[in-house]
Amino acid sequence: MLTTTLFRSIASCEINAWQDMYSAAGHELSDQFGIKVFSMGSACISLVKNIDILAFNRVIGLGLFQTATEEMVDNIISKYKNAGIKRFFIQIHPEAAPPQLKDWFAQRNIVHYNNWVKHYRGVENPPVVETELEIREVKSKDDVDRFGEIITLSFEWPDEMRLWFEHLVGRKCWKTYLALDGDRAVAAASMYVKDDCGWLSFASTLPDYRGKGAQTALIARRIQDAAELGCKVLTVETAEDNEEKRSQSLQNIQKMGFEVAFVRPNFLWKAE
C-alpha cells in the first residue's frame, strides 16, 4: 500500500536523482548545454538552454513538501524566460498544494499537455527472467561509450549528450547497465540508489531489438541489485498507455510487479 511515508520517499528519491544527474554534467558540459538547476520551496527547477527537450526543462516537486505561491510560479516562468528557453514542463503531484495551482497555471497560459505514470514496487521476490542476452554493469571504456550511445540513439537525442550520460558511470549512488547480444550492446538502463529507495531511469533499446525482452531483463537485474544494496522500494515513471499511444515501457514494468503510485499531469508553458 502506498502510505504517505512511502509517497514522500519515492518523490524525494526522484528529486535527488535529477539534481545529481545535473551535477554529474560537470562545468564543461554545463557551459556547453546551458545547464542550470535551482530549488524553490520543494521544487527542483532544471534548465538546459541549448537542448529543447521537455524531459530536461521541467519543474518537479512544486507544492509537494512546501506550499507553492503565485510568486513562485511567476519566478519559475521568469527563470526560463531569462534563460531564453522556449518551453518547459511543470509536473504536479497529486498532493501538491495549494489546490489553486492549476488555476494559477491557467491564468498564465500554462496548459495541460499529457500525463506520466509513477510506479513503485518493493524488492522482495525479484522476478527471474530467462534471456539469451548478457546483462552486465558498465565498467570498461568500451562499455561506457556504448552506454551513452545507446541512450542518445534510442531516444533520438543529440549525439553530444552521450558524454553527459557517460558521466553517470561509476558515480556515487548510480548503477549503469548494458544488455548485449554477443558482442553487440543493444540496450541500456540505469538506477539511482539513495537510502532505502531506488529510481530506475533511462531505459533505452536500439530500434531493431525492441520487443525482445532486453528491458525486462534489465529491470530484473536492477531489482536484484537494489535488494542487495538494502533498498526497500523502487520507483520508475513512464508515459501513459492508452489506445491513442501504446507504452511498451509501462507494460514492461507492470509485468515485473510494479504498481501505479499516481498519475502525474504535465503542464506546458510556451513562449508567446
Show where each model-derived region lies.
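Short amphipathic alpha-helix that is part of the acyltransferase structural core
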Residues: M1-A25, W116, Y120, N125-M161
